[in-house]
Amino acid sequence: MQKDFIIDEWQIYQAKAYGADCILLISEILSDREIKQFIGIAASLDMDVLLEFHQVTELSKILNSNLNIIGINNRNLSTLETTPFHALEIRDMFINEFIDHDIVAESGISSTLIIDKYLSNGITKFLIGESLLRESF
């Protein structure tokens, strides 16, 4: 997956050229038009799209995207503050809207206790990066 701040279509072509089969789109930095355009480009390249959001104000963009896989970022990109169960709280607030979606909890997943809480509440997909990089094996 190309996990980047994608703001231009050339980045999608570049991701495909480098072997990515999925791209991450961040709703807070893209317009509805850009989201639709980038989803279309990804589909034409046989790539999946993970569309993420943090703020509830972005919900209409998410639901209008017609994607089945939705990421809820536990990190507020404006403040960089991380709330480990934000994704669970948002999913629960809008459970009916997300009934047909696979939810990916993103960021702030730093322990098996956090993962266990998500699993026991039906969220089984995670995007984990920083905590793996900081872990010593």
Regions found by a protein language model. Give the residues of each.
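Generic structural signal for well-ordered alpha-helices
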Residues: 12, 35, 39, 59, ...
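Glycine/Thr-rich beta-alpha phosphate-binding loop at enzyme active sites
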Residues: 63-92
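C-terminal helical cap(s) of enzyme catalytic domains, especially alpha/beta-barrels
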Residues: 84-94, 119, 132-137
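Short, hinge-like loop/turn segments at secondary-structure boundaries
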Residues: 18-19, 41-43, 67-70, 88-89, ...
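Glycine-rich phosphate-binding active-site loops on the catalytic face of alpha/beta enzymes
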Residues: 14-34, 71-80, 109, 121-137
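Catalytic cores of alpha/beta
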Residues: 7-19, 54-66, 96, 100-128
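Catalytic beta/alpha-barrel core
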Residues: 1-8, 21-32, 46-57, 70-81, ...
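Short acidic, glycine/proline-enriched helix-loop-strand junctions
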Residues: 42-47, 99-101
